[in-house]
């Protein structure tokens, strides 16, 4: 019996691996069929996450509209996508210059997209601008710039494209947000405020457009790290507050977020949080034990201000 168990273990592991492989392949093919021939608009397509979303959706056969502030960056992304794609299974992406912080140009860009394809099936609001610093040292001009890029830009583009989706009674709007839409982190007042605002808008919009079969989805990771980012090493392990902040800052890779965006589109999920247990616990504590949460965060700020810089 012991020998039989030893022999069965490798076979069991092999069988599980085979089933996982089949599931992943089936999921990949299913994802492709969900976006094939669909007109997909991706904002800030030249960012790390934007590039990965473009890669995933282009491979799935979507008719991409890639928006970005830098034309050279868009052309570089275009060259990368077309160099590895099968022309018989993919469509040539359309490139559009778009700076969401410049609200005046958003309507013209949306009109250009609709004139080209006649519709938009999926809108991925990915653009985001960050700023970090004490609230009293952040100028109102910078506060407004953050709100334009993170709030007014996405909702303006959404409002212009939404009537087309409503009239066709189909479409999906995906907001790539941040877990800071659920609770604020010190020294990120403008960024957190913009994320709270845009989450509130799309939460309300979701209920408004459900009767038209338009899906509104939000994907909120803790932090989208760069390809070269690595966790910062500090002697904070003994502090609960700083342990929380360190865990929160690890974030997720753009590839992971792009794959989750694709799954969200395929399954028409309404809300997704991409976070390890510590940030999820923070959301829970903030909701049910707010006074304790505020005390812990304030304690963390005091400790951070009292820790001398290294080097």
Curated annotation (Swiss-Prot):
Keywords on record: Membrane, NAD, NADP, Oxidoreductase, Sarcoplasmic reticulum, Signal
Enumerate the catalysed reactions.
Answer: all-trans-retinol + NAD(+) = all-trans-retinal + NADH + H(+)
What GO terms in the biological process aspect are recorded for it? Answer: D-glucose import; intracellular calcium ion homeostasis; regulation of release of sequestered calcium ion into cytosol by sarcoplasmic reticulum
Tissue specificity, in the record's words, reads: Expressed in skeletal muscle and cardiac muscle. Also expressed in liver, kidney, adipocytes and skin.
Subcellular compartments: Sarcoplasmic reticulum membrane
Note on domains (UniProt) = The N-terminus region encompasses a short hydrophobic sequence bound to the sarcoplasmic reticulum membrane, whereas the C-terminus catalytic domain faces the myoplasm.
Q: Which named protein is this? A: Dehydrogenase/reductase SDR family member 7C
Native species: Mus musculus (Mouse)
